């Protein structure tokens, strides 16, 4: 079985910044098979059901063409998710906005809990710290990088990029 992941990667202008709101190319935020990019860590939900819900949310977010990519406007997705009260059933109500890879993950985590769990300030550089600050909710599962046996909601990344198993 192919592991499908969601991620946000590059704006329609081919850059990390300056993109228009919304997915202009259908490739800015997407779902696709797992790929190698030098991953060094895996963060796993301790609760399987929360992991599945985060994976579902990430997939719905990635398939919503109102969500595009631009690091300089990344918080606009977070603001839209706050507007719909982190209700996974209302993801289709999100208006045109942007995110980056880490904000997509943060929003998926918050949807898994149905509330603000993580702030919009998390980036790929500090995302692994949730295993320490929220150890009752998350754990490291770095051995999965070798086996490629990922669970729904697994966040796979390195400093600079992260993807989530959907």
For each of these PLM feature ranges, what is it?
Residues 16, 24, 122-123, 128, ...:
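Intrinsically disordered/low-complexity terminal segments and short unstructured peptides
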Residues 162-166:
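Short, compositionally biased
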Residues 1, 148-149:
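Short, surface-exposed loop and linker segments with low hydrophobicity and enrichment for Pro/Ser/Thr
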Residues 114-138:
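Short, basic/aromatic beta-hairpin or loop at an interaction surface
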Residues 1-117, 159-161:
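N-terminal capping segments
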Residues 136-148:
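Short alpha-helix capping/helix-loop boundary micro-motifs
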Residues 152-154:
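Loop/turn positions that initiate beta-strands
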């Amino acid at each position: 079985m192919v592991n499908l992941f969601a991620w946000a990667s590059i704006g329609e202008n081919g850059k990390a910044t300056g993109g228009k709101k919304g997915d202009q190319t259908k490739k800015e935020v997407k779902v696709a098979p797992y790929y190698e990019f030098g991953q060094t860590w895996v963060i796993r939900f301790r609760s399987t059901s929360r992991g599945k819900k985060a994976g579902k949310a990430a997939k719905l977010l990635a398939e919503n063409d109102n969500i595009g990519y631009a690091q300089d406007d990344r918080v606009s997705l977070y603001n839209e998710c706050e507007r719909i009260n982190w209700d996974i059933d209302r993801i289709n109500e999100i208006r045109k906005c942007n995110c980056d890879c880490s904000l997509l993950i943060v929003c998926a985590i918050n949807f898994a809990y149905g509330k603000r769990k993580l702030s919009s300030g998390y980036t790929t550089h500090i995302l692994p710290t949730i295993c320490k600050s929220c150890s009752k909710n998350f754990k490291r599962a770095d051995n999965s990088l070798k086996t490629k046996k990922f669970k729904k909601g697994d966040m796979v990344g390195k400093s600079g990029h992260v993807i989530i198993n959907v």
